[in-house]
Design a protein with these regions (language model features):
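N-terminal, positively charged/glycine-rich alpha-helical extensions of SAM-dependent methyltransferases
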Residues: 1-44
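Class I SAM-dependent methyltransferase SAM/SAH-binding core
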Residues: 80, 86-133
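Conserved beta-strand signature within the Rossmann-like core of class I S-adenosyl-L-methionine
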Residues: 173-180
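Conserved alpha-helix/loop element of class I SAM-dependent methyltransferases that forms part
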Residues: 54-75, 92
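A short glycine-rich, Lys/Arg-flanked "PGG" loop and its adjoining helix->strand segment in the class I
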Residues: 160-172
Length: 251
């Protein structure tokens, strides 16, 4: 992975002038891409494949949280969602017992933050900002979530900086929840899959538990419209799955 020159970062790890300009350009590109994407019905949670994938992911995430003993800590946990969108996962954590005042969501798109504030409990904190610098967020977090954020970033040093910030804001016994795809989409030049090796590079000296999940969307979308049962059966065949759901912990 390409590493930025030493002058790109300040002594405390914050972006320097070179990185800041590069990150701003990449952030503008991402905003433009996702502003258009939000208009596509294929990404609606009411689309059958999206709905089934969401249900599968929710079940697997709850199992993972229980595996690491986090299910009993949700009520007191401070949770940060990086790239929170409309706040769907923060709402789920509230449903699972999290206290809204302990939850924070950030997103690059102001319209997503506006939507999140309109549909989520008012005690949840939402900020429209880049994840490359989280110094304005008070305190540390027990859980940091990211969902298809890293595959949306094409600038390697920006990915590294966000990973560093997520780790910096994570408590020593906390966990990062990772959900992203590992297979490139030849039809979409605006994203890039992230394989296990790159995840390890982004989070060195961490314990990483990844499981394959989510039936490949080009296959799953037409099947889900015909048969939910067939979709679920095929999603159990791991070579057909395109995403990783995982837990990342500090050593």
């Amino acid at each position: 992975m390409k590493v930025a020159p030493e002058s790109d970062l300040s002594a405390d790890g914050a972006p320097g002038p070179i990185s800041a300009d590069r990150f701003a350009d990449e952030s503008d590109r991402i905003r433009a891409v996702y502003s258009k994407r939000g208009e596509r019905p294929v990404y609606s949670v009411l689309e059958p494949a999206q709905m089934l994938a969401l249900q599968e992911r929710e079940k697997k995430l709850l199992n993972m949280l229980a595996l690491y003993g986090f299910d009993s800590k949700i009520g007191e946990a401070r949770i940060l969602d990086v790239g929170c969108g409309s706040g769907i996962w923060l709402r789920k954590f509230v449903h699972w017992g999290a206290s809204p005042q302990n939850l924070v969501g950030i997103d690059l798109l102001s319209e997503r933050i506006t939507e999140a504030r309109s549909v989520c409990p008012p005690a949840i904190t939402f900020r429209c900002q880049n994840a490359t610098d989280l110094t304005n967020l008070a305190g540390d977090f027990d859980l940091v979530l990211q969902s298809t954020v890293f595959t949306s970033i094409l600038e390697p040093q920006m990915k590294r900086q966000i990973a560093n910030e997520m780790l910096r804001k994570l408590r020593a016994d906390g966990m990062i929840v990772w959900y992203d795809f590992h297979v490139n989409n030849p039809a979409n030049p605006n994203v890039r899959g992230i394989v296990r090796a790159e995840i390890r590079q982004l989070f060195p000296d961490c314990r990483i538990h990844l499981e394959k999940l989510t039936l490949a969307p080009p296959l799953g979308r037409p099947i889900a419209r015909v048969s939910h049962g067939l979709y679920r059966a095929l999603s159990a065949i791991k070579p057909l799955c395109t995403h990783y759901l995982g837990i990342i912990r500090k050593v």
